[in-house]
């Protein structure tokens, strides 16, 4: 099963107004948020919070976690601290809310102060909701808020799962970032740096489930799930090693996806976050088989890379020697005459090279999988009217006056899983130097320096799905040699 289409929460005015009723505010930049935070909290309170966060992240102990969320449940702190998650609540709340029907009895596991639980109860007054959390202060606040909002179809309980048995059964169980909380756990490694595939290692799977606490929590929830019940789950499982580990934990318990898992994208202040995916699962019927996607998520356009100036010029000339598929040209009243070439390099890289008589040069390169997307850019440039032409060029490559023309800028760089496809397809590869490191825990890292046609390349890969491919013209190959040496000195990863 593939991935579902991302859903936009922007039109959910009910949820926006509801979050605002908690005192939450939406911020799109860190500076504004922290200025507002400092206007509300004293220096001493900020220092105490900082110490509490350090204490919590110093270990995975349950007591640290409970203490952390007990403090956060202060009525004066909730608006300040949870405003950082405004977009998270908006995105998750919208996605989950539409999936609640036809449930009649819903359990929200790890409900916190009940922000989303109470919203769901408000939207579905005929449905019974139960929220549980191990933080007693969070539950106290959740109860007060539900009473204030006169919600009669909801109750909250303190419960430490799996230490305490859950009572009753539910036809829908919700869990958002509460089942798999070991954030530093990378999950299952791949078989080697050459592949994204995992071994079927049941012993390692079970050991990880026990170590992370997932086994006990998931088993406890399943004991409370009705025979035809569903679970809607959103965890921090975007990294493939974590995702496959989590999916296999669901699969071994007879759970299957009943809708395509949906990636969730939201803003955390000024940082764009993609996480999840959001799973909707139920028990397998007799004779049914489950289909879980264990491939990396490929985002449209992820292979595309843009550069300007000398890097664009050098690489553009090299690419044009192979195959120019189409050319468009014209004259702009402000930018002068221009030409845009669209081509294919050795059946591996698609590219578009733009230059004008004002001296600006811009290049965009991508993998074959983004060929249609890049060709659409070419068609847009070819057909766009003059008033919008300059804005399009600036949006795509930046303002010419601000363009960096650093001689160390690569001609192409890719930090996504798709880098592996391009690396494997590079023509006439000649490996000049390579090193592979292992630490005995399934972690393996490979770094390779080489040449392909008249380009130099650096490739970096490990068994937790990180990939990096850098291409540069031969004249500047010494830059990649320096990167290679630095990486050998610090084998945790390539230099930024």
Predicted regions and their residues:
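Conserved alpha-helix/loop element of class I SAM-dependent methyltransferases that forms part
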Residues: 85-102
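Conserved SAM-binding strand-loop segment of SAM-dependent methyltransferases
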Residues: 150-161
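Conserved SAM-binding loop
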Residues: 142-143
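Conserved beta-strand signature within the Rossmann-like core of class I S-adenosyl-L-methionine
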Residues: 202-206, 228-235
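Mobile active-site "lid"/loop adjacent to the S-adenosyl-L-methionine
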Residues: 178-220
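Class I SAM-dependent methyltransferase Rossmann-like catalytic core
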Residues: 67-90
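Conserved SAM/SAH-binding beta-strand->alpha-helix loop
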Residues: 135
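Conserved SAM-binding loop of SAM-dependent methyltransferases across substrates and taxa
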Residues: 113-125
């Amino acid at each position: 099963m593939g991935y579902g289409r991302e859903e936009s929460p922007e039109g959910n005015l009910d949820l926006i107004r509801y979050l605002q009723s908690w005192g939450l505010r939406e911020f799109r930049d860190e500076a504004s948020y922290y200025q507002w935070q400092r206007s509300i909290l004293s220096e001493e309170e900020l220092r105490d919070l900082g110490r509490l966060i350090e204490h919590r992240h110093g270990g995975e102990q349950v007591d640290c976690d409970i203490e952390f969320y007990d403090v956060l449940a202060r009525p004066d702190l909730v608006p300040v601290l949870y405003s950082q998650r405004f977009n998270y609540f908006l995105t998750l709340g919208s996605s989950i809310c539409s999936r609640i029907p036809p449930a009649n009895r819903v359990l929200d596991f790890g409900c916190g102060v009940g922000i989303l639980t109470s919203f769901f109860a408000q939207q579905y007054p005929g449905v019974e909701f139960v929220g549980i959390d191990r933080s007693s202060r969070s539950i106290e606040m959740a109860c007060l808020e539900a009473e204030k909002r006169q919600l009669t179809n909801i109750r909250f309980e303190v419960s430490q799962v799996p230490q305490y048995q859950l009572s009753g059964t539910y036809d829908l169980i919700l869990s958002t970032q509460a089942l798999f909380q070991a954030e530093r756990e990378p999950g299952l490694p791949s078989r080697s740096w050459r592949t994204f595939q995992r071994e079927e290692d049941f012993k390692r799977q079970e050991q990880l489930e026990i170590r992370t606490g997932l086994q006990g929590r998931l088993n406890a929830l399943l004991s409370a799930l009705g025979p035809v019940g569903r679970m809607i789950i959103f965890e921090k499982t975007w990294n493939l090693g974590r995702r496959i580990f989590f999916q296999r934990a669901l699969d071994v318990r007879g759970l299957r996806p009943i809708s395509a898992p949906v990636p969730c994208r939201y803003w955390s202040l000024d940082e764009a976050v993609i996480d999840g995916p959001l799973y909707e699962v139920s028990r397998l019927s007799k004779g049914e088989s489950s289909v879980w996607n264990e491939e990396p998520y490929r985002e449209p356009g992820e292979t595309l890379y843009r550069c300007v100036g000398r890097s664009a010029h050098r690489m553009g000339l090299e690419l044009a020697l192979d195959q120019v598929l189409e050319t468009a040209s014209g004259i702009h009243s402000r930018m002068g005459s221009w030409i845009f070439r669209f081509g294919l390099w050795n059946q591996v890289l698609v590219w578009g090279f733009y230059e004008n008589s004002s001296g600006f040069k811009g290049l965009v390169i991508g993998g074959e999988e983004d060929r249609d997307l890049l060709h659409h850019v070419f068609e847009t440039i070819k057909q766009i009217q003059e008033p919008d032409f300059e804005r399009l060029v600036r949006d795509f490559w930046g303002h010419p006056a601000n363009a960096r023309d650093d001689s160390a800028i690569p001609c192409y760089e890719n930090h996504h899983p798709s880098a592996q496809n391009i690396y494997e397809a590079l023509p006439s590869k000649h490996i000049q130097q390579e090193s592979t490191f292992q630490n005995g825990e399934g972690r393996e890292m490979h770094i390779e320096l080489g040449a392909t046609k008249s380009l130099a390349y650096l490739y970096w890969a490990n068994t937790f799905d990180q990939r990096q491919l850098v291409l540069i013209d031969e004249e500047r190959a010494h830059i990649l040699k320096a990167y290679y040496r630095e990486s050998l000195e610090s084998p945790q990863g390539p230099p930024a």
